Amino acid sequence: MSQREWIEKDYYKELGVSSTASQDEIKKAYRKLARDLHPDANPGDSKAEERFKAVSEAHAVLSDPAKRKEYDETRRLFAGGGYPRGGFGPGGAGGFSQGFDIGDIFGGTAAGDGGLGDILGGLFNRGGTRTTSRPRRGADVETETTLGFREAAQGVTVPLRMTSPSPCTTCHGSGAKPGTSPRVCPICNGTGVVSRNQGAFGFSEPCDGCRGTGSIIDDPCVDCHGSGIQNRTRTITVRIPPGVSDGQRIRLAGQGEAGLRGAPSGDLYVTVHVSQDKVFGRNGDDLTLVLPVSYAELVLGTTVSVPTLDGRVGVKVPPGTADGRTLRVRGRGVPKRGGGAGDLLVTVKVAVPQKLDDDALEALERYREAEKASGFDPRAGWAGA
């Protein structure tokens, strides 16, 4: 990314949020836009695809506190001063040459380098001078997938189709034409920086000969024009482990955006959304369900067959069970990450018949009389009696 692009891109506007937006607001805005603009939801729509890429790029920066801080500092530092096209320019910090990519100054950001102070410290030899050019690791990428309740509980392998910067398939990320190789820059000897003195200060600045990369490509790849990166659509197979919960993020190392000229790729983060189930609920590793029973079954007791994630199991309802009681079946819940499984929690709920035939009504009347004769009072001890 050129210095002007870095400064002029408004990631906040891209997501439709203010510059003071919280992480939750940023995440909510991104999720809505990503769902609306995803290539799978807009097949053949190139405008939606480009917008999806821009939204993903904005989220990758603003969702990372360190990257967001550096982005804000960069815009404050350069945007307000009418910066010259070539960089800091006359009167600035050493007059960088025209065409230098400010992304090379901030190239270590995705790899977890420090903030703007570290960068300026390097320019003015504060805390030591860089001796080697760090590879520019690719940016992290975020995407989402929705699973069924049982898929999330038991684990599943899903294909994810996504469009992002990836290593060039022609040069395999080197940036050089097949059959050739980049050569070490003779000016900086591969360090990517050159040093000079001005008065009492020693300066380190990106090398003009190699644009701070440490190497020179004499014969660039015709497909990626020397960057080593191409935008392409790919399908990644993602293994979702058993027991994943709604909103959980899964990291796939090295599956994010490709690094510059063969540098390491970023990571892919997949946020999992879990659909509700008609039968089951979940409480941590425990599986929950509500079991309809009759009054007679609660009073007399019974055994009822109920579903689990891997078949059915008989649940014994003891005689005299109260409505709303929860019965526990150990080890028949959601698989745990370290092995074993949670429990199945079965809550009994009495189902009141809406219509009874004459025989049933007569039997129920006889039961009511017998209940009174036994001295049973359902409201005994009730505070409202």
UniProtKB/Swiss-Prot annotation:
Signal peptide: none annotated. It comes from the Bacteria. One of its GO terms (biological process) is chaperone cofactor-dependent protein refolding. GO terms for molecular function: ATP binding; heat shock protein binding; unfolded protein binding; zinc ion binding. A zinc finger (CR-type) spans 155-233. Zn(2+) 1 binds at residues 168, 171, 221, 224. It is found in: Cytoplasm. CXXCXGXG motif repeats lie at residues 168-175, 185-192, 207-214, 221-228. Residues 10-75 form the J domain. Binds 2 Zn(2+) ions per monomer. CDD domains: DnaJ (cd06257), DnaJ_C (cd10747), DnaJ_zf (cd10719). Zn(2+) 2 binds at residues 185, 188, 207, 210. Keywords: Chaperone, Cytoplasm, DNA replication, Metal-binding, Repeat, Stress response, Zinc, Zinc-finger. GO terms for cellular component: cytoplasm. The keyword S-adenosyl-L-methionine does not apply. The keyword Zinc-finger applies. Its cofactor is Zn(2+). Homodimer. The J domain is necessary and sufficient to stimulate DnaK ATPase activity. Zinc center 1 plays an important role in the autonomous, DnaK-independent chaperone activity of DnaJ. Zinc center 2 is essential for interaction with DnaK and for DnaJ activity. Belongs to the DnaJ family. NCBIfam families: DnaJ_bact, PRK10767.1, PRK14279.1. Participates actively in the response to hyperosmotic and heat shock by preventing the aggregation of stress-denatured proteins and by disaggregating proteins, also in an autonomous, DnaK-independent fashion. Unfolded proteins bind initially to DnaJ; upon interaction with the DnaJ-bound protein, DnaK hydrolyzes its bound ATP, resulting in the formation of a stable complex. GrpE releases ADP from DnaK; ATP binding to DnaK triggers the release of the substrate protein, thus completing the reaction cycle. This is Chaperone protein DnaJ 2.
